């Protein structure tokens, strides 16, 4: 009688879903008010002029304009600003 022993079962095969974090609009690019600039965990980047921050630390534009990244202070904090579009 031909028999085949049961194969072992793998204990692998699990992973968390990616959160799609990071910079969504880069320096010099145009953005509309309410547009998401950066999705992040914690304040890796800080809001500057015309930029708001959500409860999940998402940075978003408060006005229409162009995105500008800079550093500030001795700690070299990464700041995100929106330069308003010329009207």
Swiss-Prot record:
Keywords: Ribonucleoprotein, Ribosomal protein. GO terms for cellular component: cytosolic large ribosomal subunit. Residues 1-21 are annotated as: Disordered. Coiled coil: none annotated. One of its GO terms (molecular function) is structural constituent of ribosome. It holds the Pfam family Ribosomal_L27. One of its GO terms (biological process) is translation. The keyword Transcription regulation does not apply. PANTHER family: LARGE RIBOSOMAL SUBUNIT PROTEIN BL27M, RIBOSOMAL PROTEIN L27. Belongs to the bacterial ribosomal protein bL27 family. This is Large ribosomal subunit protein bL27.
